[in-house]
Regions:
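Active-site neighborhoods and metal-handling regions in enzymes and metal-associated proteins
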Residues: 1-354
């Protein structure tokens, strides 16, 4: 079933049309990414509106949509209201998760159809991935693995975090990335105790841990990985913390399969870290799912009591962060299957000392 056909199955109940305003939902339905635009989906027809910057690409690549331009004379509201009239739409399901209050009130006031919150049904199709989506995500992760293998040859004492971040971004594009899944995190020394620290002018030194959290995207689909490496040498404490994080990750991956609640997977990793005496230093969730967005749902974390289905792609990223000293995080991307999970990250997980 094509993605657009999946959206059409939602039109048998509370709504007779879908208003797609998020880039991700438009990408999913049209199976092609256009940065700006709005789409309407009905059983009588589907239209995609965008401006002159993207119209040629949209006309060439979008599947299943009539493509129309918006300009100074004819804007989105006029295009939408024409479609509403042409297709006899009375109720439009909209993506409340992606609209600001200002945008919602604008649509609610101007459109000639009732707006119904409909984010969850629209979003639900993206939770589990089709085989072709998994193939794109494998390609994205392979690109990220190649970038890691290259960038670690460039890490040297004396370079700054920002310089390393620039090298990392270059390596992702050089190795085939069509974009970045997110802005990379590159931190060193005591800054590695900041789970989402920001690269700065700090100079990398011998004896530092360096943590890199990064991911290339490929044709819109994300990858995500984190590796912590040591420069020159690692102390016994650094090695012990690293080994603890790795054990937590491997134990949780082994416990992951379809039907297991997200909180149980999170709890498996958390118990390993707590038993080693570092429980208070693992503050974030074990992982998140990903796809067209870097953070999706459902996720393997403590707040998710629902069983995870096969076909969900999720990160596995426990960490320990000792304030003012150092931190360690190891992250892979896994695909949940009926009898386990497939780790699609190919980079080594043993402690690398450069």
């Amino acid at each position: 079933m094509k993605n657009l056909d999946k959206y059409l199955t939602l039109l048998d109940g509370d709504v007779d049309g879908l208003l797609l305003t998020s880039r991700y939902s438009r990408h999913y339905g049209a199976e092609f990414d256009i940065a700006e635009g709005v789409a309407i989906v009905t059983k009588k027809g589907c239209r995609y509106f965008t401006d002159s910057r993207y119209i040629e690409s949209a006309e060439k690549n979008l599947k299943g949509f009539e493509v129309l331009d918006v300009n100074r004379e004819i804007g989105y509201i006029q295009r939408l209201n024409t479609a509403i009239a042409d297709f006899g739409v009375t109720t439009l399901g909209y993506e409340e998760h992606y609209l600001t209050a200002e945008e919602y009130f604008h649509y609610a006031e101007k459109l000639n159809a009732k707006l119904v919150p409909f984010h969850k049904p629209i979003y639900a199709f993206r939770a589990t991935k089709e085989d072709w989506e998994l193939e794109l995500m494998r390609k994205a992760q392979a690109i990220t693995d190649r970038a890691f293998a290259e960038v670690i040859t460039r890490i040297k004492p004396g370079m700054t975090e920002l310089e390393l971040q620039a090298e990392l971004i270059y390596c992702m594009y050089k190795n085939g990335g069509t974009g970045l899944a997110f802005d990379p995190i590159v931190v060193s020394g005591p800054n590695t105790s900041l789970p989402h620290g920001v690269a700065g002018e700090r100079v990398i030194q011998k004896g530092d841990f360096v943590t890199m959290d990064f991911g290339a995207s490929y044709m819109g689909y994300c990858s995500d990985m984190t590796r912590t490496v040591a420069v020159g040498y690692a102390t016994d404490e650094m090695k012990h913390v690293y080994d603890t994080v790795l054990k937590a990750q491997l134990t949780a991956i082994a416990a992951t399969k379809a039907g297991v609640p997200g909180k149980d997977i999170d709890g498996t990793a958390r118990k390993v870290i707590a038993d080693a005496g570092y429980g208070e230093y693992f503050g974030h969730g074990y992982g998140h799912s990903l796809g067209l967005e870097i953070h999706e749902n459902p996720s393997p974390n403590a707040s998710n009591t629902e069983p995870l289905p096969a076909g969900v792609v999720c990160s596995a990223e426990p960490g320990i962060y000792l304030p003012g000293k150092f931190g360690v995080r190891i992250e892979d991307v896994t695909i949940i299957t009926e009898d386990g999970c497939e780790d699609i990250t190919g980079s080594p997980k043993n402690l690398i000392i450069l």
